[in-house]
Amino acid sequence: SAASDVYKRQHYIYQKEQLLLAVPKNYSVNTRLQEYQIPIEEIRNGQFRSSHIPSVPLNKFENEPFIILRSDNDTGKRALTICQENHFSPSVVFRLDQQMTAYNIACLGMGITFIGDLLLSRVPTNSELVFYKLPGQSSKRTVFFYWKKGRYISRAMEEFLKLPFS
């Protein structure tokens, strides 16, 4: 079972991640929400995590198209939980498997998506999107690396785990 598998694994905390809302910049809803917009530089340097940065009211995106990851994906689960916690039902136009695909489709202006700050800190800057902080604790998670307990850990893996991922 999945629960007993957890005890058969070892893990390493990779990083904390926070989901953000990525909205195509040409959506008119953005003009009414400028005080909530976060520059990509503040996402990359972590300043957006400050409690002084306000979360966007999700209901403002009520009639907009959303790109959501499937519910067997943690990001997809969290996106739906965030929506439920905010009494909001997204109008879903795409259900996808990967954050990167959702990001690329959002860049094309085809919908709003939930995206992690780890991905945003590693992709080239795209001026076609506007970013917003999400409300609640469901937008925050810890990312782990897992491996089977008792398995040989190669020198390459040891060195990889020592790398600074910030």
Show which residues each predicted segment covers.
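Short, small-residue-biased leader/transition segments that mark boundaries at the very start
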Residues: 2-7
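A late-sequence structural motif
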Residues: 58, 117-119, 128-166
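Secondary-structure junction motif
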Residues: 29-31, 36-86, 153-155, 161
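Short hydrophobic segments within beta-strands
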Residues: 22, 67-69, 146
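Short hydrophobic/charged patches on amphipathic alpha-helices used for structural packing
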Residues: 11, 58, 102-103
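Short Pro/Gly-enriched coil loops immediately N-terminal to beta-strands
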Residues: 11-27, 34-44, 61, 134-142
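Hydrophobic hinge/microswitch elements
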Residues: 71-130
